């Protein structure tokens, strides 16, 4: 492969890299590699999780970065790691404390999945994160992209890491003007261009260049076949879920009537109608089933507790 081992490349590295191009890469892929290494060196972001040698810390950052902006994750990641510095520490923590730390990041299911992953690793892997893609994919909340990121960033192993910034670069450089570009079309190039010697540095360069592209032009990843607009949060079921979780965490315990009243007050303050009790009950039942809080008693006597 035509990659260097260092993350920050000097300005003259393009010619050196170009002279070592692999025959298996197309001319377009060779040009992409040269450009990405050089742009990545110029645009490198010194993020806190890039300066640690801890697979668990890398995993936390990758899960937080799912659908959340980097600037917000920076603040939360450092606080989270200070409170839960190891997989064992997270595994033994109260679920309510983990959820409290997560408030403001959104998509609270990620916090529950992260804690369950920590519990599995503590119980089955001696408090360590597995080092194979297959074992990582079996853990809660870890899909193909997250597993690929962990393999590259935590273990310096070549992997398929196709997330939004990476997708942006490959669509922009290899499919100019094309609409509805599928991941199946991108994956062979992503696989072929991944550095065997420094996958970590390679994907850092892709991420930073992709982030730059999105800030300077219409987002190329919108031309992906898989691009979807994030659903509206205001007034959504997701917002109602988040509000009920916040209420139980703050109160530690609440009755169903209190949950109905709290959500009704919240909706009215937003200029919306109070939700029907059946909707509230459906949401509460889902939250209990998913492990956000526990239920004691049934029917009108039920109480909901932060665990």
Kindly give the residue locations of the regions a language model identified.
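Intrinsic-disorder-associated, low-complexity terminal segments enriched in Asp/Asn/His/Tyr and depleted
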Residues: 11-12
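Short, cationic-aromatic polyanion-contact patches
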Residues: 297-307
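Basic polycationic patches enriched in arginine
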Residues: 7-8
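Short, hydrophobic-biased segments on the C-terminal half of alpha helices
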Residues: 281-285
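Catalytic cores of DNA base-excision repair glycosylases
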Residues: 20-241, 247, 251-257, 262-271, ...
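A short, conserved structural fragment
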Residues: 288-299
């Amino acid at each position: 492969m035509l990659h260097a081992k260092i993350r920050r490349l000097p300005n003259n590295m393009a010619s050196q890299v170009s002279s070592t191009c692999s025959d298996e890469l197309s001319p377009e892929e060779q040009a992409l590699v040269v450009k990405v290494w050089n742009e990545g060196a110029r645009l490198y972001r010194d993020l806190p999780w890039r300066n640690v040698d801890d697979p668990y810390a890398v995993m936390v950052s990758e899960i937080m970065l799912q659908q959340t902006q980097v600037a917000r994750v920076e603040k939360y990641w450092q606080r989270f790691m200070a409170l839960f510095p190891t997989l064992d520490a997270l595994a033994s923590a109260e679920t309510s404390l983990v959820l409290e730390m997560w408030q403001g990041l959104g998509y609270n299911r990620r916090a529950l999945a992260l804690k369950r992953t920590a519990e599995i690793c503590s119980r089955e892997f001696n408090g360590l994160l597995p080092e194979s893609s297959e074992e990582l994919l079996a853990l809660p909340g870890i899909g193909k992209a997250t597993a690929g990121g962990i393999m590259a960033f935590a273990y310096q192993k070549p992997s398929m890491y196709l997330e939004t910034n990476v997708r942006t670069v490959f669509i922009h450089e290899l499919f100019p003007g094309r609409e509805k570009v599928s991941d199946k079309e991108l994956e062979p190039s992503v696989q072929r261009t991944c550095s065997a010697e420094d996958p970590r540095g390679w994907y850092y360069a892709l991420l930073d260049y992709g982030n730059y592209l999105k800030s300077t032009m219409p987002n190329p990843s919108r031309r992906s076949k898989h691009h979807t607009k994030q659903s509206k949060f205001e007034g959504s079921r997701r917002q109602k879920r988040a509000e009920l979780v916040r209420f139980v965490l703050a109160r530690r315990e609440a009755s169903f009537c209190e949950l109905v009243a709290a959500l009704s007050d919240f909706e009215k303050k937003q200029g919306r109608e109070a939700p029907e009790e059946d909707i509230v009950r459906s949401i509460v039942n889902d939250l209990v089933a998913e492990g956000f809080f526990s239920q004691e008693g049934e029917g009108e006597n039920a109480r909901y507790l932060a665990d």
